[in-house]
From Swiss-Prot:
Pfam families: GIDA (PF01134). The gene is trmFO. Belongs to the MnmG family. TrmFO subfamily. Keywords: Cytoplasm, FAD, Flavoprotein, Methyltransferase, NAD, NADP, Transferase, tRNA processing. This is Methylenetetrahydrofolate--tRNA-(uracil-5-)-methyltransferase TrmFO. It comes from Cereibacter sphaeroides (strain ATCC 17025 / ATH 2.4.3) (Rhodobacter sphaeroides). InterPro entries: FAD/NAD-bd_sf (IPR036188), MnmG-rel (IPR002218), MnmG-rel_CS (IPR020595), MnmG_N (IPR040131), TrmFO (IPR004417). GO terms for cellular component: cytosol.
Length: 444
């Protein structure tokens, strides 16, 4: 008799994982604490409840990374994408969903599946035996979170996001910015040039502070937190403490020499640090923020060298429970310390409904394959799913790991021989390559 797979959490990731494993012939026990134990964000006990936006973002699978992820999930017969398409709302090129019928249909399909049984209970600690997928999301219960912390180490779980904006490297004006680590620290050339620096004059700095203070901000949601941790203060809060605070904090100019104008002394410097091994993404150091998204783009484009910046992710601070996955998970999403346990979804450090469901899809398939005596490798990094799982299980820098949406900066660069591609053509090249690779992976 085939042994059962236990899945904890029936959000996007857990629901998709359960569906995939059951469709492969593996019995699934799906554990969900709602509605018996609620959270401040959920309204119902339905599976895959959309607690924030009702959008799955762009459905363009030719020129958009999340649209490509939609395509891959459809190709893999994903339940979440099937139900999203069935309850689609008019939204231009985006995939918007009628959230309540969507959740109801996901719940019905899972409860009706002959190989899926649902247990309405809270799991309070990590199990020591059996096959498990933990897909409890950013609102993991405090008891389970404490158990995860105890097993993996005190620093392995973050309960509060300090998310800095991430910029595509190709959109940074390097005729203004330059590469240098503070005081030229580092033993190798890569280390000595690990940061991109954007200089500001006094007037530019003062205008930037004015814009920060005037920008629209979002407030913490009830149940998140009543205040800030000093280690991840929003830049606008630092500015409120004094106009010079940032210049003596993340924007301090010391130890840096402008490679373009060595005689000029910057009044302040904004630093960007590489965010992935490919060097295609850079985060703005110390720039966690609660500014609204529209305000962020206008304020951050005031920074010299970032006037035409393209953002892979904007900043934010909010409660989030997620693992330091590059340190703790192997490439099959197994916990290295307890390989019988996999993690999936937002708790692994991906951001967004679709990304969470995609990691659930992979975890469900990988766990089912293992139970059936087979090994299923992750998709190639040229695919959207492969790029995401590669990022969270080793491609990201462990010391600065933060939740990430899918974006083309996670993919291995496209060979641009024959001239520089236009952006749209380059994106099409990414998606065409990904579709071929994903189709081959599915067939294998």
């Amino acid at each position: 008799m085939t042994r059962s797979l236990h899945i904890v959490g029936a959000g996007m990731a857990g629901s998709e994982a359960a569906w995939q494993a059951a469709e492969m012939g593996v019995p699934v026990v799906l554990h969900e604490m709602r509605p018996r134990v609620g959270t401040f964000a959920h309204r119902t006990g339905q599976f895959a409840e959309m607690v924030c936006s009702n959008s799955f973002r762009s459905d363009d699978d030719e020129r958009n990374a999340v649209g490509l992820l939609h395509w891959e999930m459809r190709a893999a017969r994903g339940l979440i994408m099937e139900m999203a398409s069935a309850h689609r709302l008019p939204a231009g090129g985006a995939l918007a969903v009628d959230r309540d019928p969507f959740a109801e249909s996901v719940t019905a399909r899972l409860r009706e599946h002959p190989l899926i049984s649902v247990v309405d209970e809270e799991l309070a600690e990590l199990p020591s035996d059996g096959d498990w997928i933990i897909a409890t999301g950013p609102l993991t219960s405090s008891s389970l979170a404490e158990s995860i912390r105890a097993v993996t180490g005190a620093q392995s779980l973050a309960f509060f996001d300090a998310i800095a904006p991430i910029v595509y490297a190709e959109s940074i004006d390097m005729s203004v910015a330059w590469r240098q680590s503070r005081y030229d620290k580092g033993e190798t050339e890569d280390e000595r040039t690990a940061y991109i620096n954007c200089p500001m004059t006094r007037d530019q700095y003062e205008a930037f502070i004015d814009a920060l203070l005037a920008a629209e901000k979002t407030e913490f949601h009830e149940g998140e937190t009543a205040g800030y941790f000093d280690g991840c203060l929003p830049i606008e809060v630092m500015a409120e403490r004094g106009r010079e605070t940032l210049r003596h904090g993340p924007m301090k100019p010391v130890g840096l020499t402008n490679a373009h104008k060595p005689q000029d002394k910057a009044h302040a410097v904004v630093q960007l640090r590489r965010d992935n091994k490919l060097g295609t993404l850079y985060n703005i150091v110390g720039f966690q923020t609660k500014m609204k998204y529209g305000a962020q783009t206008s304020v951050f484009r005031m920074i010299p060298g970032l006037e035409n910046a393209s953002f892979a992710r904007l900043g934010g601070i909010h409660r989030n429970t997620f693992l330091n996955s590059p340190t703790l998970l192997d490439d099959r999403m197994r916990l290295k310390l307890r390989p019988n346990i996999r993690f999936a979804g937002q708790v692994t450090g991906v951001e967004g409904y679709v990304e969470s469901a995609a990691m659930g899809l992979l975890a469900g398939r990988m766990a089912a394959a293992e139970i059936l005596g087979r090994d299923l490798p992750p998709p190639p990094p040229e695919t959207a799913m492969g790029a995401l799982i590669t990022h969270i299980t080793g491609g990201a820098e462990a010391k600065t790991f933060q939740p990430m949406n899918v974006n083309f900066g996670l993919f291995p660069p496209i060979d641009a021989r024959g001239g520089r591609r236009g952006r749209k053509d380059r994106y099409k090249a990414y998606t065409h390559r990904a579709k071929a690779a994903f189709t081959e992976w599915l067939a294998a």
